[in-house]
């Protein structure tokens, strides 16, 4: 059983998938920073100094109006945190676009390789070549 597991774990596809997951996790951190620290602040300024992370709808009323999603959650108020959802949608769009660019380049590279590696047409069998020579000789006589 251990031998089978080792063979499975050391297959190229499993190792490639593991590397992809690790790189994906690191890429997620980069994208989150890009969205939260670089993209959203200018968008917030353009919209009048808005910080989307604190946009929410309180589902119950309380005596004290919470000023942030975290404050509302600490007070036990259920909220719909649509500002965080907006950030998540933007992050998803960035990741999807980045993956699109990578896959697009890979497909282009595969197409170039396929064009360069097109197999040469196979040579006709020797019998066929001899028959064509005989045919050509008979036509020349005739």
From Swiss-Prot:
Alphabetized UniProt keyword annotations: Cell inner membrane, Cell membrane, Ion channel, Ion transport, Membrane, Transmembrane, Transmembrane helix, Transport
Localization (cell): Cell inner membrane
GO MF entries: mechanosensitive monoatomic ion channel activity
Chief location category: membrane
Membrane topology annotation: Multi-pass membrane protein
Pfam family, one: MscL
Domain of life: Bacteria
GO cellular component, one term: plasma membrane
Cytoplasm recorded as keyword: no
Disulfide cysteine pairs (residue numbers): none
Annotated transmembrane regions: 14-34, 83-103
InterPro entries, per the entry: Mechanosensitive_channel_CS, MS_channel, MSC/AndL, MscL_channel
NAD is among the record's keywords: no
Family: Belongs to the MscL family.
HAMAP family on file: MscL (MF_00115)
Subunit organization: Homopentamer.
Cross-referenced PANTHER family: LARGE-CONDUCTANCE MECHANOSENSITIVE CHANNEL, MECHANOSENSITIVE CHANNEL MSCL
Role this protein plays: Channel that opens in response to stretch forces in the membrane lipid bilayer. May participate in the regulation of osmotic pressure changes within the cell.
Protein name: Large-conductance mechanosensitive channel
Organism of origin: Parvibaculum lavamentivorans (strain DS-1 / DSM 13023 / NCIMB 13966)
């Amino acid at each position: 059983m251990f031998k089978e597991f080792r063979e499975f774990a050391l297959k190229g596809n499993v190792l490639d998938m593991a590397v992809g997951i690790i790189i994906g996790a690191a890429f997620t951190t980069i994208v989150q920073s890009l969205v939260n620290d670089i993209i959203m602040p200018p968008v917030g300024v353009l919209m009048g100094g808005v910080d989307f992370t604190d946009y929410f709808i309180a589902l119950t009323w309380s005596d004290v109006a919470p000023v942030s999603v975290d404050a509302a959650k600490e007070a036990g108020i259920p909220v719909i945190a649509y500002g965080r959802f907006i950030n998540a949608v933007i992050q998803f769009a960035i990741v999807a676009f980045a993956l699109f660019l990578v896959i697009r380049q890979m497909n282009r590279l595969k197409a170039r390789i396929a064009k360069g590696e097109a197999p040469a047409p196979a040579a006709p069998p020797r019998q066929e070549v001899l028959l064509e020579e005989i045919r050509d000789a008979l036509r020349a006589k005739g």
